[in-house]
Amino acid sequence: MHAIQTEMDQLTHTINQHNIRYYVDDAPSIPDAEYDRLIKRLTELEGDYPQFKSVDSPTQRVGGIALQKFAQITHLKPMLSLDNAFEQADFAAFNKRITDKVDNVDYVCEPKLDGLAVSITYRFGVLERAATRGDGSVGEDITANVRTIRSIPLKLRGEGFPDLVEVRGEVFMPKAAFEVLNQRQISKGDKVFVNPRNAAAGSLRQLDSKITASRALGFYAYALGVVEGESQPMQTSHYGQLTQLQQWGVPVSSEVKVTDSLEKVYAYYADIMARRSALEYEIDGVVIKVNDIAKQQTLGFVAKAPRWAIAYKFPAQEEMTLLESVDFQVGRTGAVTPVARLKPIFVGGVTVSNATLHNADEIARLGVKIGDTVIIRRAGDVIPQIVAIVPEKRPDDAQDIIFPQHCPVCQSIVERLEGEAVARCSGGLFCEAQRKEAIKHFASRKALNIDGMGDKIVEQLIDKELVKTPADLFSLTASSVTMLDRMAMKSATNIVAAIKQAKTTTLARFLYSLGIREVGEATAANLAQHFTEFERIRTASVEQLLEVADVGDIVAKHIRQFFSQPHNIEVIDQLLEAGITWPVIEQADESQLSLKGQTWVLTGTLTQLNRNDAKAQLQALGAKVAGSVSKNTDCLVAGEAAGSKLAKAEELGVKVIDEQALMDLLNAAN
């Protein structure tokens, strides 16, 4: 081996060992100055001899070429959220649900870091890719930025790790680093960050990884994700798996503890809450998980969260401040929401100047007036709420909050339907506020999926009066789009081309794009499959709508009301005249509904067709496609990297087929 290569390999190994001692073992072994000298020498050698640069070189952490945009990554298995407990009774109820189903439960308690959840995949021990949580199914590719975080190993240490290891954890910004960053922002005249979480998220989502590298981000793993090609058995407990990750060089919080009783969980919670301000990072609660992996699989999942874990949040922090005025905002569905404008107050780690008052009933319940001193709480440390007034501080000139009878944006009549708390503008797409949100929704990924039509583009199109309804999008020309700020002809041409391409869609997507209240993707798909023709949907009675799966009385009334509004029908007719089309849906006769009455579940990664297509084809055969396995499930389709759903199906004796068997079934049916 070349002498220079030997020196470079030795430097790489030495620096990576120091990184492990500093970030994983919390036991730095050399002064910072000596560490900097080692990095400087390796950087110089790599510049002169790039052919000898190692894949796990620590110099990769300084950042590379800036990206134009983030690519999308589909997670190997969904990154679910957690249910919350806000008081001891909530956790006691969670514990009862657990102990009713499994015996001898140990819990792992972990600090709930206030950062950004990420997935990091190692293949053959080398960091291959990293992604944000995103919507749980699809995240953004942040591999280049994650490589710059010094506490994250570019290469796993030791041996015995599987061929593929997915590590899930939280990227955060330590409090001290946050203060330094904001001081730097102030000195440059730049905007400061509100809190460490925002700073971490903003730093991690930089298109230029050099910016990420310049900010001191940290990382702690909190779980294993997908594992493939194990050379030895994996640990059978959550705590054991975290220990295994540490042995491979992945940092795990030293605050993680195993408890064997409810009392010890409460003691852990009280202890870490008391030490919260002294920790080097922000936390907003404690995550509590069943330790035994087999018991986790027995307990399973609900739609978006595991049954075996919960986030036990800290009590919201409260402060008093002055309610100076109330504005009324109008949302996409016309909901008129009163927003309190407050004298700015620092509460729960951020400065709060606005808080929702929800609706007229809430204003009446609180008895609040303009000029009152109010108590602000950050519920779950996220959403500012007015929870009470301080009557003794009310001034003589306090003013009643008068709910508007006309929309503050378009002056249409504000209506409040019987049985609903929310008042709504009746203006529909005539209302500019609804118009903006409606067009954003219309162009969104799950609706017509107009590539490049982001929120800021929509806002400019409306502000410049180029667009008033979704139908107007199809009249845009490249030259008119260039009127937008910083919009070159090439970009404008691409947007117009994307709009034209979006004319070909599906009936389900078109229905969803209209923004009918309570009509999400699933309901839109059910409506399309049931009626097969748009004209039948828009003329359907409430009684006919109630025949559709998952459509109840309230949703049926919302649909009927939407199609009874002349301005909505006018826009729909314009859209159809603009050339929006979709494939004809053939009404299957009863003999073709071979899966009618059956409940199917999909899990894992499908390689021959995407999950939405599989779901649609199963529904076309009469099946109901559910999100979780139960004793009522007739069949589970297990794709690659199938996880807990497969284990649950096997436990319950549910029929399991692979993707090829599904394809054979669908091909035979077609």
Swiss-Prot record:
SMART domains: BRCT (SM00292), LIGANc (SM00532). GO terms for biological process: DNA repair; DNA replication. GO terms for cellular component: cytosol. SUPFAM superfamilies: BRCT domain, DNA ligase/mRNA capping enzyme, catalytic domain, Nucleic acid-binding proteins, RuvA domain 2-like. It catalyses: NAD(+) + (deoxyribonucleotide)n-3'-hydroxyl + 5'-phospho-(deoxyribonucleotide)m = (deoxyribonucleotide)n+m + AMP + beta-nicotinamide D-nucleotide. Its cofactor is Mg(2+); Mn(2+). Its EC number is 6.5.1.2. NAD(+) binds at residues 32-36, 81-82, 110, 133, 170, 289, 313. DNA ligase that catalyzes the formation of phosphodiester linkages between 5'-phosphoryl and 3'-hydroxyl groups in double-stranded DNA using NAD as a coenzyme and as the energy source for the reaction. It is essential for DNA replication and repair of damaged DNA. Belongs to the NAD-dependent DNA ligase family. LigA subfamily. This is DNA ligase. It comes from Shewanella frigidimarina (strain NCIMB 400). The gene is ligA.
